[in-house]
Amino acid sequence: MADKLEFELVSPEKLLVSQPVAMVVVPGADGLFGVLPGHAPMIVTVRPGIIDVYGDNQTTVSRRIFVAGGFAEVTDTRCTVLAEEASDLDALLKSDTAALEKQISDLREDIEDATSDVERRALETRLVTTQAKLDLIASQQDAEAA
């Protein structure tokens, strides 16, 4: 068994990560799952959350990336995440929380005013993603304060 697997993170805009890693932990729809070299093949839905990338070993996180959801394909040598939106956690933590709260308020109003199910679902997806960002920032601030 190889000691590394290839990890790729792709958003609609660009390829964000393509590197060999020791392990990645992905927020799946049914909970977090870790991927090591030799993992059984699977395709899963990714929920909004943080991907932890372990570059050199399985004990030290080398990079943390927020994803807004998507899909992951896992093989024995590769983990590819197709994310609807992704950003480094450090960049996300610098976000203006007041602006995010305003977006949430506006999205809730837009959902109430939506004229079709398609429009409503798209707005609800944006609301879930924006709320996940705000919750993540709050939890990181709470952890730093403790």
Curated annotation (Swiss-Prot):
Positions of transmembrane segments: none
Pfam families documented for this protein: ATP-synt_DE_N
SUPFAM superfamilies documented for this protein: Epsilon subunit of F1F0-ATP synthase N-terminal domain
Cell compartments where the protein resides: Cell inner membrane
Transport found in the keyword field: yes
Membrane topology: Peripheral membrane protein
One annotated GO molecular function: ATP binding
InterPro entries: ATP_synth_F1_dsu/esu, ATP_synth_F1_dsu/esu_N, ATPsynth_dsu/esu_N
Keywords assigned: ATP synthesis, Cell inner membrane, Cell membrane, CF(1), Hydrogen ion transport, Ion transport, Membrane, Transport
Cellular component terms (Gene Ontology): plasma membrane; proton-transporting ATP synthase complex
Main location: membrane
Subunit architecture: F-type ATPases have 2 components, CF(1) - the catalytic core - and CF(0) - the membrane proton channel. CF(1) has five subunits: alpha(3), beta(3), gamma(1), delta(1), epsilon(1). CF(0) has three main subunits: a, b and c.
Function statement: Produces ATP from ADP in the presence of a proton gradient across the membrane.
Similarity comment: Belongs to the ATPase epsilon chain family.
Protein name: ATP synthase epsilon chain
